[in-house]
Curated annotation (Swiss-Prot):
<feature type="region of interest" description="Linker">
    <location>
        <begin position="141"/>
        <end position="162"/>
    </location>
</feature>
<comment type="function">
    <text>Component of the cytosolic iron-sulfur (Fe-S) protein assembly (CIA) machinery. Required for the maturation of extramitochondrial Fe-S proteins. Part of an electron transfer chain functioning in an early step of cytosolic Fe-S biogenesis, facilitating the de novo assembly of a [4Fe-4S] cluster on the cytosolic Fe-S scaffold complex. Electrons are transferred from NADPH via a FAD- and FMN-containing diflavin oxidoreductase.</text>
</comment>
<keyword id="KW-0408">Iron</keyword>
<feature type="region of interest" description="Fe-S binding site B">
    <location>
        <begin position="205"/>
        <end position="219"/>
    </location>
</feature>
<keyword id="KW-0411">Iron-sulfur</keyword>
<keyword id="KW-0004">4Fe-4S</keyword>
<comment type="subunit">
    <text>Monomer.</text>
</comment>
<dbReference type="GO" id="GO:0051539">
    <property type="term" value="F:4 iron, 4 sulfur cluster binding"/>
</dbReference>
<dbReference type="Pfam" id="PF05093">
    <property type="entry name" value="CIAPIN1"/>
</dbReference>
<feature type="region of interest" description="N-terminal SAM-like domain">
    <location>
        <begin position="1"/>
        <end position="140"/>
    </location>
</feature>
<dbReference type="GO" id="GO:0005758">
    <property type="term" value="C:mitochondrial intermembrane space"/>
</dbReference>
<feature type="binding site">
    <location>
        <position position="216"/>
    </location>
    <ligand>
        <name>[4Fe-4S] cluster</name>
    </ligand>
</feature>
<dbReference type="GO" id="GO:0009055">
    <property type="term" value="F:electron transfer activity"/>
</dbReference>
<feature type="binding site">
    <location>
        <position position="219"/>
    </location>
    <ligand>
        <name>[4Fe-4S] cluster</name>
    </ligand>
</feature>
<dbReference type="GO" id="GO:0046872">
    <property type="term" value="F:metal ion binding"/>
</dbReference>
<comment type="similarity">
    <text>Belongs to the anamorsin family.</text>
</comment>
<keyword id="KW-0479">Metal-binding</keyword>
Length: 242
């Protein structure tokens, strides 16, 4: 389960990303468009930055206004960037083209100062999803650290930043919170389904709750509407339609 505390979400300006913006707003997670993010000179620092873009990705190659480098500067030490790019089948291209895009994204993250970069391509409805995860190094100089935490009034601020975010226990919890009294909810479902134990709706790729456009081909949530992380979701586990 992703902890959305101290997280910024950057969204490209298209219809699917607008739906995501509303979804994150309901969870009190600050969001900003790519264009507005690029206009700001200084940024508050975050532990996590998500960048979602639907079909459009040319702005990621812009050397004159490098958005990846700006993201790197507004991340805390050891902060994580997660970039999610959806490419529709109607945009053309083949597996080789998609591999080249994924490799270039990884290379651009490296050039922008990130480390521990990984990428993954998964099939989605009517297209593919490229997931890139990169980490901000923890060996930044004091000068860089002071610059990133400037308090001169130009820092990016969002009114939602100061609102409380509820912490939840991860499904694969290793910190001991789950074993210290957090109980699983037992959910009873109809005869076409089975009993199962669920604490929260969890996905291995982290995109399942966003909706079909961002789900992989084998996603068990396929066909279900988007939902909030932490929301209990009932799955139809047999092969018959509802």
């Amino acid at each position: 389960m992703m902890n959305f505390a101290d997280t910024l979400v950057i969204l490209n300006e298209d219809a699917p990303c607008e739906l995501l913006r509303k979804k994150y707003a309901q969870m009190l997670v600050p969001t900003v468009s790519v264009s507005n993010f690029k206009k700001n000179k200084q940024y508050k620092t975050y532990n996590n930055v998500f960048l979602y873009t639907y079909r459009e990705y040319d702005f990621l190659w812009d050397l004159d206004d490098n958005v990846l480098h700006k993201i790197q500067r507004c991340l805390n030490k050891s902060g994580v960037l997660k970039l999610v790019l959806y490419i529709s089948n109607t945009d053309g291209g083949d597996n080789k083209t998609h591999d080249e895009i994924a490799k270039r994204l990884k290379r651009e993250c490296l050039y922008s100062g990130f480390i521990n970069i990984s990428n993954e391509i998964s099939m989605a409805e009517n297209g593919i999803i490229i997931n890139v995860t990169a980490e901000n190094p923890d060996f930044l100089s004091n000068e860089d650290d002071d610059e990133g935490n400037s308090s001169d009034g130009e820092a990016y601020q969002n009114a939602e930043d100061n609102k409380k975010v509820v912490n939840r226990v991860c499904a694969n919890c290793t910190c001991g919170k789950k074993t210290n009294g957090v109980k699983l909810d037992k959910v009873t479902i109809n005869e076409k389904e089975v009993q199962y134990l669920t604490e929260n709706a969890v996905s291995s790729c982290g995109n399942c709750y966003l909706g079909d456009a961002f789900r992989c081909a084998s996603c068990p949530y396929k066909g279900l509407p988007a939902f909030q992380p932490g929301e209990n979701v009932k799955l139809n586990l047999d092969n018959e339609p509802n």
